[in-house]
Amino acid sequence: MSDKEGETALYNDREEEARQFFSDSAEPQSQGGSNELAVNENEDNNNDEVEDDADENIYSIQAHKITGDEENNREVTMKKNVRKAKKYDEFKNERDEQGFVPMGENPEYGGMDYSNEDPQARKRRLLEEKMESAIKSKTSRRRRADEDDLERMQDDRIDFLKDQMIKAANLDVEKNSQGQIATEKLKLLNEVVDILSKADLAISILDNNLLEAVRLWLEPLPDASMPAYQIQKELIHSLTVLPIKTDHLIASGIGKVLVYYQRSKRTEANLKKVVDRLIGDWTRPILNKSDSYKDRTIQFNEYNKNRFTNQLSSARRSKPKEAKSLYEESAERRKRAAIPAARTTAYKIAPKVDPSLLRRQQLNSNGNNDERFKRINQKLTSMNFKKKSSKKSGPSIEGRNLTI
């Protein structure tokens, strides 16, 4: 037998002995020396390379020495990889250092204990939870950043428009004081109306105090002339859409300008109705008044015809001459007659009627009323009788009432 065949037989015999040794019992047997727990540092590189998943779970390598033949006088070390899972305490400490709390141990999810869970199942579960938490945190951060960017863009847009409006108002004031035509606000009116009509910008408009620029646009010019009617109409109608609160009124001061429009005789009638409604809506919360008609309190006062006539005549004599509207002024300038315009009158005091006085008046006038009623009734009945008698009589087409 050659040397090569002898080495092969020796290797097979030793391999069979090692396999029988590991299959007989789990406890190491002492054979020519004590079993020891160690890592063979002189092992070849090919035997050291292990997969990443296996390296995470290998914590010890159990080695057993098997004596060889006396002729060769060498020993073969057979190694058994003992794979152990991490202890729960070590895993928990490592997880706490990373700042990660799995859903299973979160009190919000019941606080379940996974200490006896299979290592592979635990590893898979933790990986899934990390991925879910990472995805949720990234999306939430991205959403918040987008919202902040959008709000910042809206604020910048409102601030830029506010600066433009203030600049245009100042230029119109300068031109009006110099006797020139003020047209800067009219050039910018379409852009301002476009911004004020957008519902998604309402909060940004109020927070950035764009109402201050609106107040400057509605204020009279230095020569006491009103702004262009188109500016008045568009801006005042846009105020009805905005959710204006008391704080916004105080910061902007726009309420004073609308009171001026309410009391001015040069304000157009339909526009004055809108102004009255706005002022009523704004002052009602300040005065703690309800907008329900049922909660409305009406003031009553006794009505005396003679005294009221005397007061009315004296008031007419002492009343100053009313200011003319723009339409009346233009008609007078062209020497034309102006169509009378309806005046908005609001009555705040209701007359108090005495029921007993009404009864006495009714009793005193019953006689005259009865005679008058009889005459009218007789006249109506006679008119009806004449109509009936005037109807033509004779045979009909069908031959009814025909005498043969």
UniProtKB/Swiss-Prot annotation:
Where does this protein have compositionally biased stretches of type Acidic residues? 41-56
Q: Which Pfam families match?
A: Med26
What gene, per UniProt, encodes this protein? IWS1
What are the TFIIS N-terminal domain coordinates in residue numbering?
212-289
Here the segments flagged for biased composition (Basic and acidic residues) are 1-19, 320-332
Nucleus among keywords: yes
Report the record's Gene Ontology biological process terms: nucleosome assembly; poly(A)+ mRNA export from nucleus; regulation of transcription by RNA polymerase II; regulation of transcription elongation by RNA polymerase II
Where is this protein primarily located? Answer: nucleus
Q: What does this protein do?
A: Transcription factor involved in RNA polymerase II transcription regulation. May function in both SPT15/TBP post-recruitment and recruitment steps of transcription.
Q: Name one GO molecular function term.
A: RNA polymerase II-specific DNA-binding transcription factor binding
Q: GO cellular component annotations, sorted alphabetically?
A: RNA polymerase II, core complex
Write out the similarity annotation.
Belongs to the IWS1 family.
Q: Where in the cell is it found?
A: Nucleus
Q: Where is this region: Disordered?
A: 1-57, 313-343, 382-404
Q: Which regions are flagged for Polar residues bias?
A: 22-34
The alphabetized UniProt keywords are: Nucleus, Transcription, Transcription regulation
**What domain of life does the native source organism fall in?**
Eukaryota
| Name used for this protein in its record | Transcription factor IWS1
